[in-house]
């Protein structure tokens, strides 16, 4: 009997140890995110150019990897549309090396057999709250974990609601309830938690205020152009991704101490850049000290003093940030050369559809 108790004690200890995340003190990782692609394989025409296209996206990511960066590639949902090019998208995403796809409302409504697409994918389809209507069981993996430089990230998929033309086979669980349940479990298994959310921006704000334990939230369903904004007072950083794959969102995170909070410095960097450009314009190409240049102009001297004080404050705040997050939005213009392998996959997929 005593040996049985000892065995159970050992097994319990192993389970507890295996479910607890290892401690990491420093490192960095970068998300590259898309969403609302809506079946777009090729560039989207605009007035004077074209934007997007999977061949350009692949080229950008190859260049990024060649620089020594190993990005985490995420799609927040609404990848597929009604056109029969879904398998071509999956093949391209496999070749590019995506890490996870959140299944959005349009993805379920616009695909005949999503389980076949999931089998063809070399990356997980995730959703914590899309369930089988009959059993209430999840249709997809609720989350996936990814490690970069010793830092463990949990990626959770959530969708706010399904479309009316979705299969009666599927139902939806309250995203807040599903998110809270997962975040509680994943807190001890990961260093940071990321929510891929499919829904409107207003829906995302409500979800963010309820799921304050998460660190990042990437939203599909909102089609506005992504912009750098002030971070929220509480809850995860919320990032939009645009639509049709016309651009890529990058979120670069540098961790000096996992026990310290994250700080989005995107707006601070923009502020510092703007102030430096202003001072450069005031100098007018001269190498003379600004104070000497405007010594006889009291109002201008006071303005320069205020500007330099603002610059000093911005630089102090940047220097004092322990764990930093930097958002960027990169349009995929025609200046980016098409990747030949992705072009071949798209052409082959187009031929197959026409047969």
Report residues per predicted region.
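Hydrophobic h-region of N-terminal signal peptides that target proteins for export
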Residues: 12-19
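Bacterial N-terminal signal peptides that target proteins for export
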Residues: 1-7
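Acidic, metal/ion-coordinating pockets
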Residues: 19-355
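Alpha-helical protein-protein interaction elements
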Residues: 9-11, 36
